[in-house]
């Protein structure tokens, strides 16, 4: 049975977006289909529609990633926020985040991705999730599971408020310790078991690294054993403490080229839904999947500042969770979204594209790769993703070396 959510439709220049609860999906439809569903007119339809359905021209992001706190006791070596036991200066409280949720709801955002730090430590997390539901947004949660019985029991008590809860498990047993720098797998597993008893909408977030890539089969087998809904794989980013550990933990070119066939094989074997974060799109295009199919599956590259936005614990707006803040707070997104130069290089990917991206058939989908990786490696966020297999092959063929920024040692 197909069921729409309370925020069932949002007008866009190309037509609109239908938000479904069953099956869970955001469905992009053209103006004719929207009219047939009863949506008659919008100021966004005054101009002729873009024949390419350019999603870079959305009226608002689809989702917002809110770092509710930068407090976390774990101390993971690659933490992309650089979280600490004391958190960050100027962190917002519940009232400020409610104001942000109001602004995002007014803009027509569909989903919230709530995280940290470790947001399960916040006594008001459940209130924030409930408020998002009241305002018509679907809150989702990422959690480490590395906290005490009291916090876990509290989270399980309102777990059904979330559309999806993903526990961060970057490997099984020794692979977990290899990525995180300590052995916390048993505690994370304990959280998975408890949360799965509270709700069926539980999955895994897995950051893939050089040392854990070969252990992906164990991650999928674990997810199947625990009857989880999905496995989401994330590329390791040079952000937070990950800046210092990036060279040691990032995957090799061989691993990046093997990612898609490996994941497809494991997904079929274990009959699990798998998601790849947007920074992996260059590794998908390497296998020359038809662009029309990628568009139909909504596989896009760097979505920061367009399909999604982020916010730091202080409320400062970011293009994505891994990017530095811009000169606006998230509760001011209504004005900033339409402003000239908003999100800088995250929106300039088309006009700034250099070869081989400029002539690549996948540019409109890949968008030049991950801006955060590119900025860290080359010093230029608009340059082609230096780890894209197609970029690496082109540079090898043309005798072009990848520009690399000198590391900053602190």
Residue ranges and their predicted role:
Residues 103-116, 383-410:
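Short Fe-S-cluster ligation motifs
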Residues 81-90, 324-327, 363-398:
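Iron-sulfur (Fe-S) cluster-binding segments and ferredoxin-like electron-carrier domains
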Residues 302-306:
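Short, small/polar residue-rich loop motifs at catalytic or cofactor-binding pockets
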Residues 89, 94-116, 121-252:
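Radical SAM/AdoMet-radical enzyme domain recognition
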Residues 253-291, 316-368, 377:
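C-terminal accessory region of radical SAM enzymes
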Residues 311-312:
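Short, acidic, Ser/Thr-enriched surface-loop or helix-capping motifs
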Residues 1-86, 105, 405-409:
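N-terminal pre-core extensions flanking Radical SAM catalytic domains
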């Amino acid at each position: 049975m197909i069921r729409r959510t309370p925020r069932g439709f949002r007008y866009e220049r190309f037509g609109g977006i239908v938000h479904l609860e069953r099956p869970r999906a955001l469905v992009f439809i053209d103006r004719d289909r929207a009219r047939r569903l009863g949506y008659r007119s919008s100021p966004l339809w005054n101009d002729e529609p873009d024949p390419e359905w350019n999603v870079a021209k959305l009226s608002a992001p689809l989702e917002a990633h809110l770092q509710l706190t930068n407090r976390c006791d774990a101390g993971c070596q690659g933490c992309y926020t650089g979280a600490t036991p004391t958190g960050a200066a100027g962190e917002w409280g519940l009232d400020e985040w409610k104001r942000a949720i109001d602004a995002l709801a007014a803009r027509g955002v569909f989903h919230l991705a709530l995280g940290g730090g470790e947001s399960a430590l916040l006594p008001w997390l459940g209130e924030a999730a409930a408020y998002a539901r009241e305002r018509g947004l679907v809150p989702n949660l990422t959690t480490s599971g590395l906290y005490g019985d009291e916090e876990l029991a509290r989270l399980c008590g309102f777990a059904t408020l979330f559309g999806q809860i993903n526990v961060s498990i970057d490997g099984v047993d020794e692979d977990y310790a290899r990525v995180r720098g300590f052995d916390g797998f048993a505690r994370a597993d304990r959280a998975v078991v408890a949360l799965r008893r509270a709700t069926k909408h539980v999955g895994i977030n897995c950051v893939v690294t050089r040392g854990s890539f070969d252990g992906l089969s164990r991650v999928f087998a674990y997810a199947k054993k625990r009857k989880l809904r999905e496995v989401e794989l994330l590329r390791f980013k040079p952000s937070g403490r990950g800046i210092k550990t990036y060279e040691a933990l990032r995957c090799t070119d061989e691993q990046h080229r093997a990612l898609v066939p490996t994941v497809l094989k494991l997904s079929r074997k274990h009959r699990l839904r798998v998601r790849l974060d947007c920074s992996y799109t260059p590794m998908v295009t390497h296998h020359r999947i038809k662009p029309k199919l990628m568009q139909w599956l909504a596989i896009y590259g760097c979505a920061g500042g367009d399909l999604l936005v982020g916010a730091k614990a202080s409320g400062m707006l970011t293009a994505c969770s891994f990017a530095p803040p811009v000169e606006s707070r998230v509760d001011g997104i209504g004005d900033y979204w339409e402003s000239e130069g908003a999100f800088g290089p995250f929106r300039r990917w088309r006009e700034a594209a250099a070869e081989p991206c400029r002539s690549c058939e996948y540019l409109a989908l890949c968008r030049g790769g991950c801006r955060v990786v590119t900025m860290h490696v080359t010093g230029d966020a608009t340059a082609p993703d230096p780890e894209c297999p197609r970029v690496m092959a082109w540079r090898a063929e043309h005798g072009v070396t990848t520009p690399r920024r000198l590391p900053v040692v602190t």
